[in-house]
Amino acid sequence: MNEKLKEMREAWKNLYGSLFKWIVLSGVIGSFIGLIASGFSYAIVWVTSFRQANPMIILGLPLGGLLIVWMYKITGQEKNSGTNLVLTVVRSDEEEVPGWVTPLILISTAITHLFGGSSGREGAALQFGASVGNVCAKYLHLNESDKKIIILASMSAAFSALFGTPMAAVVFPMEVISVGVMYYAALVPCVFSAFAAQGISLLLKVRTVTPPYLVESVPNFYSVDSIKAIILAIACALVGALFCIVLHNGEHYLKKWFPNPYVRVVAGAAGVIILYFALRTDAYLGLGTGVIQASFKETAGPQMFLLKMLFTALTLCAGFKGGEIVPSLFIGATLGSFMSTILAAPTDICAACGMVGVFCAVTNSPITSLLIAAELFGFNGMPFYCIVVAVSYLLSGYYSLYKEQKIVYSKTENKYVDKHTK
């Protein structure tokens, strides 16, 4: 009996000790990352405003690209695979995210947005979060298991501070690494780091990438509108898979045609500049949050999501930095907005469904997608978001933005597959 009591005391001591440790560590690291993310957010807002006030600065995009390639080369990070490296680090004991990544990705993303590259900034968030977490783990002499947990918590913090969706930020790093397996050991650290980081960003009045969107027109779920949601979900799955194919093939062929990274980045920049002057609009440059917001009120043109794909592929595949998730939200919102005319459905609910549907298709993260929907659009349309996310997740197959993402369990049957995404 005494032996059992002793074991129980030891078990409770370990549990409460672990809770205290992770609350303190994740709270401090989340607050620190919140400060970095807030500064980064203000930098992106400033460079975007400067670009919009001085549109001809886009002619400097090739020079910006050359600077980015040079910075990665002199720091020995020219082979850095970005977010794919982060996914590998969490699964493997052999890789790590070096400290150099934080200044490199933040500066490179700011340069990309200053000169008009079409990209997001969540790639930067996940990478600098993982980099900070890795450095902290080293200085704190954490073991390999705790290091991976603190990296996930740091990713949650960065995502939360920039996107303003802390609940989605908690789940995304745990869900995106290996589809079908959740890293629940990181749940407590991810929760406290995400909310600490968001608290700092709110305190500093950071403008998030995705402000809440008002969805007023929610149809009756038990009607023909639920069938329309399935049709929209199919479109989201197809477009999401297409976006992944365009990005991966774009990277492959640009490397094949332009083996020299300096020539490659100039070629990509030239493509963006030519398209910009041909179309005479800056709607596809930078984050494109203005277009996302407009998609909820006005019907988007059928070409908009396709052009955003093209601009983003030329930018990121050439060697510029930022991320693919905000472009995927742009693509989803404009696709949904356009589909609203075909489906004879309200524009705002279709744009919202399009955003979460394409996000789910390209990340294979259905739980995160639903949490994003709840935090951005509220719960009124949740039955529609559930349908769109579920169908889009299934029909997008094994495509993903991230080549190092793994599908652990099949999407169509209860079967262990453990395969890399396409």
Predicted segments with their positions:
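Alpha-helical transmembrane segments and immediately membrane-proximal extracytoplasmic
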Residues: M1-K422
